[in-house]
Amino acid sequence: MKIRSLSRFVLASTMFASFTASAVPGLWQQGYGQGNAEYSVTDASGKMFTINCTGNPDQNGIYQHSVFLILAGDKTVSSHDDSTGITVVMDHKQYAIPSTLGWRNGDNAWFSFIMDIRKARQFDVYVNDQKVGSFNPDVRNAQKVLPTLADCTND
């Protein structure tokens, strides 16, 4: 799983390198490549939060959607990394992003997150219980750009 995560990091970093330089903070952007739809938003300091909605199921037929962050110094962290816990806090609720999907609690957590992120005016991201960023997305932009329920779940 770690090799697959590393290749996803490389792909994601390459795909969004051009977005980082030209991204307007707070506006979601959409990209697509190799069967993955990716939705990214940056903060004022250039940190990028990305939702990866894969169109490629794993060997068990499960769509392993994920999030990743590009932090200062181009350090990338992913929810697929077993040693990394990513939590998103929005509207005074926390959403622990599961490292894998295809199990009831993980699917339920992902479903709640993906349904609520479209409505968030502000959210904070924590990696291993340390706050790493605050994002202030435009809600109207989010509702236009972010995926619908069917695009980014296992339902």
Swiss-Prot record:
Residues 1-23 form the signal peptide. The keyword Signal applies. Keywords: Signal. To E.coli YkfB. This is Uncharacterized protein YfjT. It comes from Escherichia coli (strain K12). The gene is yfjT.
